Amino acid sequence: PYTFRNPLYHWTHLELKTAFGIDKILNPHTAREIYDECNEKLKQPEYSARGMMRRYHVEVVCTTDDPIDSLEYHIKTRESGFEIKMLPTWRPDKAMAVEVPADFRAYVEKLAEVSDVAISCFDDMVAALRKRHDFFAEQGCKLSDHGIEEFYAEDYTEVEVKAIFNKVYGGTGLTKEEILKFKSAMLVVFGEMDWEKGWTQQFHYGAIRNNNSKMFKLLGPDTGFDSIGE
């Protein structure tokens, strides 16, 4: 009941009805019964991931993937001969997340390792991202998806953006203006990459993340406690 007026309330009951044939309202009194019923059905072959996709006549599945993801399961699925296409979607949000310098540096270091590109400046990071962008294209990617709180369109110069990268990569916090400039620059960079390959660019706009402070401390970020920003 605490999800009422949140899309999760409708989505949850829609899935229970259409996928599992369950009409009950999910609440503390029915949770165990529904949980057990769903798990019993999930043991059946027709309720496996592939079974469900076949049941709903799915032709293509597009996942959401970070630039540093290996896409190994996309490759394995394709090589297995599975008749439904599984394609990656480029979701580079963490490359724009400069609010916490330590987290940003850790991400850039992972990007450098995965791309095999030494990163010490802004241009290096863009080169590494472009290499991963090429890899995603090789695996059939045709879409990008960007989770943003607003459409960033702050004026900036290349000199400013390079200095901002050096500052945050060096561990110094940024001002609000610097954050907006950096995010604006990255949206342009990603837009150019997508345009060059003819990809469709999508914006997951206005979602408020990590609303539940208790669960954020327990589980970490992006674990399902989002809502629509209004």
Regions found by a protein language model. Give the residues of each.
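Long, well-ordered mid-to-C-terminal structural blocks that present hydrophobic/aromatic surfaces
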Residues: G173-E230
